[in-house]
C-alpha cells in the first residue's frame, strides 16, 4: 500500500504543478483569501488512495475507481460552492481516472520487477 501511495503521489505532482494556478484561483475565489496548503494533510489522502489502488484487478477498473473517487470530491464541491467551475470538476475527475490507471500500470510493473 505504501508503494502504491508513493506512485500516486509521484504521478500526481506534474498534474498539481500544471493545474496549480487554476486551483489556487478557484480556492481564492471561493474563500476570499489565497490558497494555503496544509501539506501534512496529504499523507492520509495518499494512503487512502494507495489502499484503494491496491484493491484493483485491472487498469480499466482502476481508472473507473479513480474517476469515481475524484468525482465524489469534485462534484460535491461543485454542488456546495457557486464559484467552483464545472470545467474544473470535469477535468479533475478525468484526471482521477488517468491517475489511477497509470498508477495501476506502474504498480503492476513494480510487482513484476520485484519478482525477478
Q: Where is each model-derived feature located?
A:
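Juxtamembrane/disordered regions of integral membrane proteins
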Residues: 1-116
